[in-house]
Amino acid sequence: MAVKCFSLYLILAAIVIGGVTSEYIEYNTKPRIVPEKINVHLVPHSHDDVGWLKTVDQYYVGSNNSIRGACVQNVLDSVIASLLDDENRKFIYVEMAFFQRWWRQQSNAKKVKVKKLVDSGQLEFINGGMCMHDEATPHYIDMIDQTTLGHQFIKTEFGQVPRVGWQIDPFGHSAVQAYLLGAEFGFDSLFFARIDYQDRAKRLREKTLEVIWQGSKSLGSSSQIFTGVFPRHYDPPEGFTFEINDVSAPIQDDPLLFDYNVQERVNDFVAAALAQVNVTRTNHIMWLMGTDFRYQYAYSWFRQIDKFIHYVNKDGRLNVLYSTPSIYTDAKYAANESWPLKTDDFFPYADKPNAYWTGYFTSRPAFKKYVRDLSGYYLAARQLEFLRGRDSSGPTTDMLADALAIAQHHDAVSGTQRQHVAADYALRLSMGYLQAEKLVASSLSFLSAAKSSTEKKNPGTKFQQCPLLNISYCPASEARLLSGKSLVVVVYNSLGWKREEVVRVPVSSENVIVKDASGKEVVFQLLPLSEIALRIRNEYVKAYLGRSPRDTAKHVLAFTASVPPLGFSSYVISDTGRTARGLSASYVTSGSMNQNVEVGQGNLKLRYSEEGVKITRHLSTKNQVTAEQSYAYYIGSNGTDKDPQASGAYVFRPDGVLPIKSKEEAQLTIVQGPLFDEVHQELNSWISQITRVYKGKNHAEIEFTIGPIPADDGISKEIITKLTTTMKTNGTFYTDSNGRDFIKRIRDFRTDWDLQVYQPVAGNYYPLNLGIYMQDKTSELSVLVDRAVGGSSLENGQIELMLHRRMQHDDIRGVGEILNETVCLPEGCKGLTIQGKFYVQIDKPGDGAKWRRTFGQEIYSPLLIAFTEQEGDSWINSHKTTFSAFEPSYSLPKNVALLTLQELENGEVLLRLAHLFEVGEDSEYSVMAKVELKKLFHNKKIREVKETSLSGNQEKAEMEKRRLIWKVEGSAGEEVKRGEAVDAEKLVVELVPMEIRTLLIKFDDQIEMVGDKEQQHRL
């Protein structure tokens, strides 16, 4: 019977296959758009994280694959080979940190072939930054810099200009990304995947996933950009992924093989496409053919895409083509559709009811501060590199630029990487700093060179710097001064206006005085180092350097430095051999703070009592505002069996809040002096703070020390501070967008949909990079921060900041590691302690913007301090002790910031100027500003000025000619008139509120005077 059945099967098989042969099939994949059909744009891509579970280099070479089998080198090798095989295939690439690594390893012959692929459009660079930066935790200057670095590489090597923004993975999207990192780069469109699940559901219903996004109220319609949100994630529809180990069924089109399924797979494709058509406008849809670290064996993808294009087009119901986001954008524009207008931003982001991705606004606060500190340092170092003259053979800022660029990645500064990856980012930053530190020292030595060229040439000054000043460690200032020697302190100001600011350095002796370069004694203040400060200093110097401090600093010396714009001043610290007059008066309160203590002069007071610290500002005789400061911690949720969502590196899910009260025998140390008063307060064994008020200033500075956060009880803790007032704020507050624009927030409200509130705390948290403020009819309270943090106003008249986090559970978002930072010493490891500052000012309504904008610049760009010793007055008498790059008495207007002054490799100089104020923000400063380039570069002759896009990769005029003007539903508002083109004779730059202008400048060769010494400087 079995033989008969088998014979029958052979007969039937012969009938089925009879006349059919297996042969080569030439797939027709020639791209075309068919107006009368649904056009499906297939976009092959690989999303390559510049560090996350593995380090950037491990991801590139494919090492440490026990964590994840990912090798970007294989992706690029494989993709390029596949593109060369078929001219119809296309691929987009985004992360230049990886492509740059791959590019420098290629032969000249391979480079020629790749350039042809780029020129033909087969390989297109999208976004084009070194990484796909985060949008919540970076400062806008860092976002500009990292993108510029990638764009310069693309322009230099390929002569190309990216057209599309591609922020597919960041966890929420900022207004600054839309208008500044989009429209101002000359991008025609911006695409991403992650928006709030409630927002997505509404947009799917209403076909509003694609919009015109107007991110700036100040720049209006001139800064709009077409924006597309993907219907699902940034991967293909289910059943269409084709990496080697993926489970999607391939098209099997050989009739001699089993499982022939062409029509079945064509039907699957058509069904998925028609489903997407139902949620978007026009007859064009885009499929993302790829996801994380795909195309390691690119043939497995391209073979299937070839087949789908061939057979679906042959079927005739749809038109399918290899495409790119640029081609897709052009097709959308050609459709002449009107699009909804989107304003504000896409924060906060939640992917489930109890999963708000707002914890990462604060995660890894020490790393966030390190990035911010080095960002400000890099800005100053580039200026000094320009003033000295770029020397490619010596130390440069290039390594720091690269490390900072990578650190802006959405799993880097965000704090959402694994611990060993965080250490790798920090190491790269440290190595970059060491190179930039040498550059800064040599530049200051050059600029302060001998006053007279006729004098005997001095050897270059060896300047020392102190990167650990934040923990009161500075070998240069702590060293005991031998007889006849003194310490020269050179203070550099990277801002465009004069600064008078208190400088603080640790010293070992109390017998010191401070003089300016003319020999005039300067008012100073000498403070004892607290026990807490000494403990932190000793522990963390040992942790960082592997050894304890050699010297024992006993005091902090503070004096006011007066520094010209884009220049330096010099001061001299000497040991007099007798007790200094500047020793601060200090005393300690006893008992349990049962008596009221008041500190401060003028109209700003600090009051301490059993209730805590109160900051009071007298705005007038009848208007007094008091803000009471306190600490608390949220208990991070561990999740439940029903809903396992826990608080973690990404997600903030609180499960209650507990106040942190001062211990019963808490003491206050009050320090008073001629420059400032401060109060030291130890709340418990792991939280202490210093509250400081400066003479002549209207803000309070709160310096906090938090850690190690106790973990023995198994409770996740998220540490917050609150400022509570009686202001009637009606649920309204304002937070910055990447340190630039301020956006109005209303508690439990979203502009674009009716919010269903499941997490009333986490769902009202927003990212802060500059600060947060609230106001009512009588007053305005502003808080500025020194790094990226999360913040909110959860009750009327109250502001809170999240400062530190230590978790006990992972939040199931892929990192697979608990956020539990520790510091390790030979005697063991313990939780990380962080130090930081925030600043509080109370103003009349509408008056706070001036302080937020100008003081915010001082926070971002602290004074740069360098030290050298001298014998007698030898250095002061033989060097230039003060310097400004500007024409004497000239400074930038207070509403303009100098963002970038950088000499490029080709000798051109990149200059960025930014208006700091928004429209209507301040009656005095929200107006057009003018900058005179001749006075900025008064000792150089400007030969040519060319205005460019924000990244400097194309002329502004050409960019504007190509700009797509989209139709908007309803009113798009008036287009804002920007500053006039720079006249070649007058050389005046005009800036309207929130405008940033980028210029490439060429100078004539000339003899210029630097430090009264002639220098031939070719620029």
Swiss-Prot record:
Signal peptide: 1-22
Cofactor binding remark: Binds 1 zinc ion per subunit.
Gene3D superfamilies, alphabetized: 2.60.40.1360, Glycoside hydrolase 38, N terminal domain, Glycoside hydrolase family 38, central domain, Golgi alpha-mannosidase II, Golgi alpha-mannosidase II, domain 4
Residues carrying covalently attached carbohydrate according to the record: N64, N278, N336, N470, N638, N730, N820
Disulfide bridge positions per record: C466-C474, C824-C829
Reactions accelerated catalytically: Hydrolysis of terminal, non-reducing alpha-D-mannose residues in alpha-D-mannosides
Cofactor: Zn(2+)
Record note on quaternary structure: Homodimer.
Record protein name field: Alpha-mannosidase At3g26720
